[in-house]
Each structure stands twice: as structure tokens, then as C-alpha cells.
A protein has these predicted regions:
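Helix-biased detector of long, well-ordered alpha-helical tracts
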Residues: 1-214
Length: 214
């Protein structure tokens, strides 16, 4: 199938972040497993899994921390190039959310090679590369597997001054909440999958999801 005729969302059981495990299931998986070392006072780990932040943070000295995050999901739009852009934006923006700046990214690609042509995956990667270029970082490699449904995302590294490190548990009563993007893209992505989204709404949602949260 050619990339200009396929509808990627039809190969996805749930659009975008809708394919995440439920909090209950994730808690059941993680509870028996110790996956960070914050209890160890000698560990350079500043932010691990316990606070459910957007990225892990490791003290690398000189007042700076290395940020590490990964994010991938099933198609949230039908256009392969835009899917790559949105996936890359989602992963890179986790670094910005922690107060840092991205330095490098590597790709995570799962592709049903018996259902979707390699050229479609190339379009996804091209979209991601464009977004990485916009963020000023290289898409420096990655890993791919043959699976039954398409997934794509990035693992991204970044740097942050520790004094500027932002965590999601620091909000105080009375703080002002700023939204950097409008709400509702999840509803629109579900409508896309079911063929019920209006073209103007799709374009607005895609533009929002492709915009880096810098």
C-alpha cells in the first residue's frame, strides 16, 4: 500500500496514548519490582519512577543533570509523516517539561511488514527527523521490530541545570495553571479512527500535536 492511500489509525487498537496500560495494571506490574535506587544516598539518581515524572534525572556534576525519557504509541492520525512528527514531539516535549533541553534522540519502531509497506515507515521516520531537526537534535539511530500493529516513538536524552529541574509534585495550593495547548485532541483522534472527524478539526488537532512545547 502507498503512504498516500493508507489510513494508519485503522491498524491501531487505540489511538496514541489511548493504548497505554491502565494505572491499575501498571501499578500491579511495578509494585513487586524495585526499579529505581532513590533509597541509596550514594545514587546519582535525582528523579526516578516513584514520582511518575516525565523523565528520569541523574546528577552528572557541575550542577547539571542528565535527563532520559522514552515515549511511543500507536498511530493517532492517518498521515504517516504527521504521525512521525507527533510521536517525536511527544517524546521531546517530556524533556522540556522537566525544565531541560534535548540533546539526542533514537527511534523506536514496531512495524507490521506484512500489512504496511516499508515506504510508509520511511515517511514516519522522515516526519520524526524533521521534528528533531526543529528541536536542534539528531535522530541518531534506533531499534525496529516486526510486530502486528505499528508503533513509533523516541528515546530522548537531555540536560538540565539542577536548580531549574521541574517535577510534577512541586505544585502548591493557589498556583496558577497554564495550559500550553488546547484540550480535546484525544476526542478528535478517536473520531479520526472511527471516520467521524471533521477535516478542520483534524487539521487543528494535528497542528497542535506537532508543535514542540518549548
Amino acid at each position: 500500500m502507498e503512504s498516500n492511500t493508507i489510513k494508519l489509525t485503522q491498524f491501531s487498537p487505540a489511538a496514541g496514548c489511548g493504548c497505554k496500560l491502565s494505572p491499575e495494571t501498571l501499578r500491579e506490574i511495578l509494585t513487586p519490582v524495585e526499579i529505581d535506587a532513590l533509597e541509596d544516598s550514594t545514587s546519582p539518581l535525582l528523579v526516578g519512577n516513584s514520582s511518575r515524572d516525565d523523565a528520569a534525572a541523574i546528577d552528572i556534576g557541575d550542577g547539571r543533570a542528565l535527563l532520559s525519557t522514552t515515549d511511543f504509541f500507536t498511530p493517532i492520525v492517518d498521515d504517516p509523516f504527521e504521525f512521525g512528527q507527533i510521536s517525536a514531539t511527544n517524546a521531546i516535549s517530556d524533556i522540556y517539561a522537566m525544565g531541560g533541553h534535548p540533546t539526542v534522540a533514537i527511534a523506536i519502531l514496531g512495524w507490521p511488514v506484512d500489512k504496511l509497506a516499508p515506504s510508509v515507515a520511511s515517511s514516519v521516520l522522515a516526519g520524526a527527523r524533521q521534528t528533531c531537526r526543529e528541536a536542534g537534535i539528531a535522530l541518531a539511530g534506533g531499534h525496529s521490530i516486526d510486530i502486528s500493529e505499528p508503533i513509533f516513538g523516541l528515546a530522548v536524552s537531555g540536560l538540565v541545570e539542577i536548580e531549574n529541574l521541574k517535577q510534577n509534585n512541586a505544585a502548591q495550593h493557589g498556583d496558577t495553571l497554564f495550559l500550553t495547548k488546547p484540550l480535546g485532541v484525544g476526542i478528535i483522534s478517536t473520531a479520526i479512527k472511527h471516520g467521524k472527524a471533521q477535516r478542520d478539526d483534524v487539521e487543528l488537532a494535528s497542528e497542535s500535536m506537532r508543535s514542540l512545547n518549548r
